[in-house]
């Protein structure tokens, strides 16, 4: 198991109310993968030869080594998970890149002159750099990603979550829960070096339903809560209410030097 070490973090109170925390926390998984939280559900993972960017929405990227290729993953078309500006940013940085996009993005965006693999759920894709990508069906939109690299295996949920909403019909909530659990059962017992899972405060008392089911069924060295809409208090709430999982949960918006 890799050691996960907080490297750099800044106080989220320094951010404007219109910004998500940008590049403010770095994590190392040993000497193999460096993980940078960009914003919302967006993360940058650096390996020896490649960068992986997941669900870029907004925010600046750190300096990137032009000798490394970038692979851009977008789980679905929602604007808080897919922003085509990421390609302009990478062009301006002089980076070589390719993209792995959920098929629902192709229907709504015309992206020409890009190296793109459009993906469907429950499929396996082998990229030309040796990365293997498996997909799950999101119970909201698009897919979730399982990305297997030489350095480790990554899970990014996109919008696959136990979306229980107060005030919605009971049957709808039950359907979403059943669909979520069916997908997670497909990866039951699988090992991930890093997992990125929604923890959405808008769900009220059901905010942790999805991440709890994931933790109890899937083995991951470390789990990064995401999709919390700039309300980092939900991470501390989870750690407080479920201290038994504290060692596996990374607070992407913790202050410098805070031990979790």
Regions found by a protein language model. Name each.
Residues 2-51, 241:
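Zn-dependent metallo-beta-lactamase
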Residues 27-67, 115-191, 253-260:
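Core dinuclear metal-dependent hydrolase active-site scaffold
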Residues 33-40, 109-125, 141, 207-260:
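Binuclear metal-ion centers of metallo-dependent hydrolases, dominated by the metallo-beta-lactamase
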Residues 53-54, 73, 154-157, 196, ...:
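Structural motif
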Residues 58-104, 185-196:
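Active-site metal-binding motif and surrounding structural segment of the metallo-beta-lactamase
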Residues 59-62, 78-82, 105-109, 141-143, ...:
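Active-site environment of divalent metal-dependent phosphoester hydrolases
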Residues 65-66, 84-87, 112, 168-169, ...:
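Short amphipathic alpha-helical segments
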Residues 179-185, 204-213:
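A short, acidic, amphipathic alpha-helical segment used as a generic capping/interface helix at domain edges
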């Amino acid at each position: 198991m890799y050691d996960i070490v907080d490297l750099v973090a800044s106080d989220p109170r320094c951010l404007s109310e219109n910004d998500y925390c940008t590049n403010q926390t770095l994590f190392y998984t040993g000497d193999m993968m460096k993980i940078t939280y960009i914003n919302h559900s967006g993360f940058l993972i650096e390996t020896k030869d490649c960068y992986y960017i997941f669900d870029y929405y907004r925010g600046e990227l750190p300096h990137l080594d032009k000798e490394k290729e970038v692979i851009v993953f977008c789980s679905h078309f929602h604007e808080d998970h897919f922003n085509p500006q990421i390609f302009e940013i990478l062009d301006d940085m002089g980076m070589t890149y390719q993209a792995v996009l959920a098929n629902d993005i192709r229907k709504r965006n015309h992206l020409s002159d890009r190296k793109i693999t459009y993906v469907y759920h429950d499929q396996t894709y082998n990229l030309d750099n040796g990365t293997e990508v498996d997909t799950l069906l999101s119970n909201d939109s698009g897919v979730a990603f399982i990305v297997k690299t030489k350095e480790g295996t990554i899970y990014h949920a996109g919008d696959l979550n136990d979306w229980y909403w107060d005030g919605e019909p009971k049957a709808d909530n039950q359907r979403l829960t059943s669909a979520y659990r069916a997908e997670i059962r497909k990866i039951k017992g699988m090992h991930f070096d890093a997992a990125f899972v929604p923890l959405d405060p808008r769900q009220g008392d059901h905010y942790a339903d999805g991440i709890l089911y994931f933790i109890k069924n899937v083995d991951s060295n470390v789990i990064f809560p995401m999709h919390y809409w700039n309300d980092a208090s939900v991470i501390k709430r989870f750690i407080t209410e479920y201290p038994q999982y504290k060692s596996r949960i990374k607070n992407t918006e913790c202050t410098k030097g805070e031990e979790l």
